[in-house]
Amino acid sequence: MESQQLSNYPHISHGSACASVTSKEVHTNQDPLDVSASKIQEYDKASTKANSQQTTTPASSAVPENPHHASPQPASVPPPQNGPYPQQCMMTQNQANPSGWSFYGHPSMIPYTPYQMSPMYFPPGPQSQFPQYPSSVGTPLSTPSPESGNTFTDSSSADSDMTSTKKYVRPPPMLTSPNDFPNWVKTYIKFLQNSNLGGIIPTVNGKPVRPITDDELTFLYNTFQIFAPSQFLPTWVKDILSVDYTDIMKILSKSIEKMQSDTQEANDIVTLANLQYNGSTPADAFETKVTNIIDRLNNNGIHINNKVACQLIMRGLSGEYKFLRYTRHRHLNMTVAELFLDIHAIYEEQQGSRNSKPNYRRNPSDEKNDSRSYTNTTKPKVIARNPQKTNNSKSKTARAHNVSTSNNSPSTDNDSISKSTTEPIQLNNKHDLHLGQKLTESTVNHTNHSDDELPGHLLLDSGASRTLIRSAHHIHSASSNPDINVVDAQKRNIPINAIGDLQFHFQDNTKTSIKVLHTPNIAYDLLSLNELAAVDITACFTKNVLERSDGTVLAPIVKYGDFYWVSKKYLLPSNISVPTINNVHTSESTRKYPYPFIHRMLAHANAQTIRYSLKNNTITYFNESDVDWSSAIDYQCPDCLIGKSTKHRHIKGSRLKYQNSYEPFQYLHTDIFGPVHNLPKSAPSYFISFTDETTKFRWVYPLHDRREDSILDVFTTILAFIKNQFQASVLVIQMDRGSEYTNRTLHKFLEKKNGITPCYTTTADSRAHGVAERLNRTLLDDCRTQLQCSGLPNHLWFSAIEFSTIVRNSLASPKSKKSARQHAGLAGLDISTLLPFGQPVIVNDHNPNSKIHPRGIPGYALHPSRNSYGYIIYLPSLKKTVDTTNYVILQGKESRLDQFNYDALTFDEDLNRLTASYHSFIASNEIQESNDLNIESDHDFQSDIELHPEQPRNVLSKAVSPTDSTPPSTHTEDSKRVSKTNIRAPREVDPNISESNILPSKKRSSTPQISNIESTGSGGMHKLNVPLLAPMSQSNTHESSHASKSKDFRHSDSYSENETNHTNVPISSTGGTNNKTVPQISDQETEKRIIHRSPSIDASPPENNSSHNIVPIKTPTTVSEQNTEESIIADLPLPDLPPESPTEFPDPFKELPPINSHQTNSSLGGIGDSNAYTTINSKKRSLEDNETEIKVSRDTWNTKNMRSLEPPRSKKRIHLIAAVKAVKSIKPIRTTLRYDEAITYNKDIKEKEKYIEAYHKEVNQLLKMNTWDTDKYYDRKEIDPKRVINSMFIFNRKRDGTHKARFVARGDIQHPDTYDSGMQSNTVHHYALMTSLSLALDNNYYITQLDISSAYLYADIKEELYIRPPPHLGMNDKLIRLKKSLYGLKQSGANWYETIKSYLIKQCGMEEVRGWSCVFKNSQVTICLFVDDMILFSKDLNANKKIITTLKKQYDTKIINLGESDNEIQYDILGLEIKYQRGKYMKLGMENSLTEKIPKLNVPLNPKGRKLSAPGQPGLYIDQDELEIDEDEYKEKVHEMQKLIGLASYVGYKFRFDLLYYINTLAQHILFPSRQVLDMTYELIQFMWDTRDKQLIWHKNKPTEPDNKLVAISDASYGNQPYYKSQIGNIYLLNGKVIGGKSTKASLTCTSTTEAEIHAISESVPLLNNLSHLVQELNKKPITKGLLTDSKSTISIIISNNEEKFRNRFFGTKAMRLRDEVSGNHLHVCYIETKKNIADVMTKPLPIKTFKLLTNKWIH
């Protein structure tokens, strides 16, 4: 703070009390907000201490002897030497005299106009006119913290103020903010007190102790003006000064009034939070105290609901009342009135011996027929009981409290008592919020008779609903025999003699009448506060008076013992005859026996037995009606609970909720069986089983021991298997409490590393683990049976377990009617591949000892192999098991090898028939393979199958060759011969293989040339109307329809052997199987479900059937399907392709490279087609096709070593391990400022002021929302460190230019025990938002955007958490307890989600869409919620306004954009810049955001001043050489990659779906930041900068469309190189509008293009179904779902019923599951040409022309 001077005001002399600090005492970067309340208190203490040490005698003092006047008098003092203030420029007490004040004169003589002082501090000068702090005293900010708050003295201390003379008077600090005014006023008042002006300070009633003189008024005005500049005054202060600028006294009076109000609220909150009750005081007094506090807080705007109040009350209960905490903790809707009923019941039970009450406790959980309610008045509320019973047929019943018929009750009626002594009560104020006024309470000096009656007084009862009195001479207008039943707290009847009026004559000379009941059967005369409230009279226990609502005092309240009383002297007597009233028959009703008493007497039998016994007179002396059965149902006998304790019952079907709550493979049961003794060491002794709760799918794993690492290996395996094979994440695993499950290693692995909740069984409750226990029992039963049946040794016991598991997974459950495999989405078990356990077989010995040694070894089949397509077979002679397919079944009736009779072999027809199809399948493949072995080739055919399974081939055997033809009979013989040999089947099975297309045909084998051949390559079926042996000059070749790679590969279908003298080269088909011809289409579904884009068999020649012409197969059942599916494609943003002219093919042998030529991977991470076959009919591409326009001259951009952009896996890269560790330590990108950056050291003054304003706004909001407990500060040493959360202020500038400050918690270092990891913080999914926007455009919806300020602070926090105040506040050793969900906490998001979700459902009538969190809807409005942002969609704008009105009742809701205009409206929704014209179009972009963010990335933009036309280059590959850089440079580059790819990912997944392939591929190289990777990343950012103005364009759907159309377009790029996986991509469209896209690597390794395409489609189906459900929920129109792919072979597999196509274990399972999903979800599978497949941009880099062609229809 800079020093100030008043050189411009010469009239201000040495009498001025100005304060300042010189520039030498304050640092240059002093924080302007460092002057906090705590610092001001420190200053007060130091000032008071310093002043109290200096005293003078009256003789030496200039203070007059008049004790009622504290104004200083003139005194002769030496003139100042070097300034107006001697003694180190500090103003002494004697200098504040009229000699200095006379300069001011009368207030009318003020030498300058009011409040014209400059708002800035005065610059320092050589002759400063302000006092300085002496070094001995110190600055106000350097004094230690005071022990307690300061208080101001009242009039009683005025005399001492006069006599004490203080040498130094410390001036108050300068006011720097309107928010600091309350604290500043306290220091200013302290300044006045230290200046001997304490007598002029207003007291509680707003008046000073003595009058103020003109000189004092002038001094008061000038000092206030100097230290409180006008620009920092609150509005209410300015309003007072605008009327009278010298009325400082009014300002002080109002400030003191505000302080007193704040003090009362603070004291009430502290009192309520620290309630204690043990029954030592009457329950009525305790109830009155609590309810009065709650009433005051509610009237002051601090709402205390029933739930919070009950928790605070119960927390303070002790002794006999403590059990109420546990008996009522499940009652969610308990009220304060109900709780006090229980407290009263216990209290009265304790007083039973004195008041003759029954000696048993009333059950707190009993249902009550009465309730308490708060009267809805503006005055303090009075608690009353409802006088109505639940049964309206009975007469009215009133409830009275403190009822007693004790004979000790006094009956005298004395209207006068001795004068009560009052005892002052000093209100402790920890926060120094009041001025120290002392309040008094009228109490009777009697404390030892808490149960005695105060004679001549009425007891004030807040619990009584009626007034009762024993004396009759005060009752007016009495009537006998009233039809009123009165009961006490124990529901006992009180006889009533009469009813009348009770008339009061109060101090204000007014008469008031209330109803009264007469009864002599009570201990005290009760005055009901409820009836007083009905006549506008309330009891103020703060002032201890009865008063009206306008504040008129009627009568004093006397506290005697623990109760409050009102004198009877205010009652008016009546002339009624007492005998008239008392002559009423008062027969006491018969009292019933309490059930607990009878229960204990009859040996703790249950109520049903006792009741039945009494009804049948097996127990005499009393009847069933003599027992009070009201509490029998809910009564809990503690002795019975202890003595009869049993295990809880397991209800049948109790686990159904888990099956409904969890998805498949999310909830597992596991158990371990073992050990099995007397086994060889190689055999497992244990096994561990897993069972899925939903599907009942089982897994078993062998174990040799139960060590931690063994169990951990199994858990790692099963979790990885479920994640990769089923795309599921395990959430819960239930297990017993064995040490193998409860050890720290496994617990850490499950919870901390995988986020899995371990669910353990409770102690001695094995039945709770029934799923796993029953499975083990079943498997063991099967094991014993299998071993007995087969006669195999016991050490093969686990093989029997595994065989049983395979079978059990395939058997249907009687309940679900499905098997576990079907529930899991797997195909059924092919029993033809299964052998009986222990089936005798002969295994081929592939490595015999000699050539004459037998080639077969006897063995026993155990179970199918888990790791291959073979079978696990036990060989007794070798004492081992083998995994093989080279075996032959011994077909005999005997099942055991030791019983086998080789001389009596019989043919087992059943087994042969069962496995016939399987052996036929294997034999067919073996025949084909044997034929192919005779084909001569110049390359390795097997490698071609593995590396190029996608290339379409026409397998030509010698049967069709003129030089080497084979008769049909030869084939038949070979087939029979080969079928009996043990040739291993091929590893991969083509899904298109069946008996119809693999067995040789006589017709085909005898025909030398074929005129019409169809090939089922990756592109589907193509007609080849070309003779196979025609000369090349006349031959025509076909173009593969699958052009998904970066180059087009075309192949010749036939060669002329006569002219070329070359052997026919086979061309492989999809999947690596050799097809000699096209399979016959036998599936009727093929013609029904697929739209065939290839020509029919009788179609025209190929030149008239180009790829863009659609010629569907004409069948009687395909017309409607064709129309439906063509309508799906009609509105899609597909490119328009120009017609292509026929192409002449050159001589293939001139361009055909060697078959084994070097193969390269595709660019930018995609693995394209290998160039083993170059395009035979290829032509030179134009310059535009090859041009990329990315020709920046960089040394690293060379193509000498073209390799994949995939991370190198075959080489060890330097720093790879260090990279993984280093990335974890790299700090995230910080876009915000700290406090010191934004304020303390900020040199931009204007920005600094805006941040200061934002800071104060945030602090006020935190206080307004009651974020933390402001009543108590905690010491750090007393709190558990893990419950302490660091906090900080962060600052940032928003996109709209506003400056924002946010107080946040450091949730990144929050301890896991302080939050529930299972809670989820949900936000709206981007697909849900895009879907809602698309439907809004098609349906002319209004779109309204809202924002809820400080949303998280509306959610309460359940955990006990403390935060450290920000460091700049100087409270390093203190903590404050959180009450609200502060921003930054782990649980804040989940808490807010639950809060707003509950409000939207209950108050706004919304419901959340199942499966789509944060999407709410009703019949008119749809809401998308993203934290505190809300997007409302509705056809009627009034419906949106109605929701907004409801939200504003609870939350601070801002309307960002109402959306009512019919012109184009611009939105900024979750980062998307949207332009929307209702009923016409919608454009989505991020131009402004990218323009702001990209230049901050420090990327060299436009290196050659030209724009890029594509984001990447085809043919450019990353060098895989080792990366050798130092550690610091490595971290820096990784950090840079994170920033670049992070921004690109954000933009890509928002709307730039055309960039997702490049983003996904480069993201895999963040840990490999080579120069080449960085350059490619720069090019991507450069392309984003050049195209930052591009937008995703949507147009309104045609109004004639009857339904919604949801389409997924799929594509895949096959990865056919070792160590690399395929790339898959999907684009989703709703009514022709692109709403999302995905590009990623395949999670499974694919062995062919067809498998990659199937995997891509299968990945799109779940999201497609989810989107379909969302669309149907938001829009009730019918929906048509379509799947588009450019692979006809994939479509053929999906719609086929041929089970032979699903032999492959993984591929077959996925294909079968996909087929079921397509059929079950009514998906239309359509074919789309590759050149029109817009999903092609998601799987590979494309040339500029192709890239533009595929994207310019939907993004431009």
UniProtKB/Swiss-Prot annotation:
Residues at the site labelled Cleavage: 401-402, 582-583, 1218-1219
Residue numbers binding Mg(2+) 1: 671, 736
Compartment(s) where it occurs, according to its Swiss-Prot or TrEMBL record: Cytoplasm; Nucleus
Biased composition (Low complexity): 153-165, 402-418, 961-970
Ranges of compositional bias, category Basic and acidic residues: 1039-1054
Region feature Integrase-type zinc finger-like, mapped onto this chain: 583-640
Positions of region (RNA-binding): 299-401
Molecular functions (GO terms): aspartic-type endopeptidase activity; ATP binding; DNA binding; DNA-directed DNA polymerase activity; RNA binding; RNA-directed DNA polymerase activity; RNA-DNA hybrid ribonuclease activity; zinc ion binding
Residues annotated for Mg(2+) 2 binding in this entry: 1347, 1428-1429
Catalytic reaction list: DNA(n) + a 2'-deoxyribonucleoside 5'-triphosphate = DNA(n+1) + diphosphate; Endonucleolytic cleavage to 5'-phosphomonoester
Active site: 461
UniProt region (Disordered), positions on chain: 1-93, 126-173, 352-421, 957-1088, 1093-1112, 1131-1188
Subunit structure: The capsid protein forms a homotrimer, from which the VLPs are assembled. The protease is a homodimer, whose active site consists of two apposed aspartic acid residues.
More about this protein: Retrotransposons are mobile genetic entities that are able to replicate via an RNA intermediate and a reverse transcription step. In contrast to retroviruses, retrotransposons are non-infectious, lack an envelope and remain intracellular. Ty1 retrotransposons belong to the copia elements (pseudoviridae).
Protein name as catalogued: Transposon Ty1-PR2 Gag-Pol polyprotein
